[in-house]
Swiss-Prot record:
Pfam family, one: CsrA
Molecular-function GO term, any one: mRNA 5'-UTR binding
Subunit structure: Homodimer; the beta-strands of each monomer intercalate to form a hydrophobic core, while the alpha-helices form wings that extend away from the core.
InterPro entries: CsrA, CsrA_sf
Chloroplast is among the record's keywords: no
Localization per Swiss-Prot or TrEMBL: Cytoplasm
Protein name, UniProt field: Translational regulator CsrA
Annotated signal peptide: none
Naturally occurring in which organism (per UniProt): Clostridium botulinum (strain Loch Maree / Type A3)
SUPFAM superfamilies reported for this sequence: CsrA-like (SSF117130)
Domain of life: Bacteria
């Protein structure tokens, strides 16, 4: 893991086309601006983890519940 120290207004690059800028510093939080291509999906980690968990739940299908469905 790379740890980078930046001050307000300073940036760092990831590759050639992603720039992260420190916009605001508060007690216990940092506001970042991310300049990246539109095709790139950017998610907060907790949101990504939540989506992954919901996807796992969606794949837990019990086929025995279909026995209760009447066909015409």
């Amino acid at each position: 893991m790379l740890v980078i120290t930046r001050k307000k207004g300073e940036s760092f690059l990831i590759g050639d086309d992603i720039e992260i800028t420190v916009v605001k510093l508060d007690d216990g939080s940092v506001k970042l601006a991310i300049d990246a291509p539109k095709k790139l999906t950017i998610l907060r980690k907790e949101l990504y983890n939540e989506v992954q968990e919901e996807n796992k739940k969606a794949t837990n299908f019990n086929p025995s519940i279909l026995k209760n469905i009447k066909s015409k």
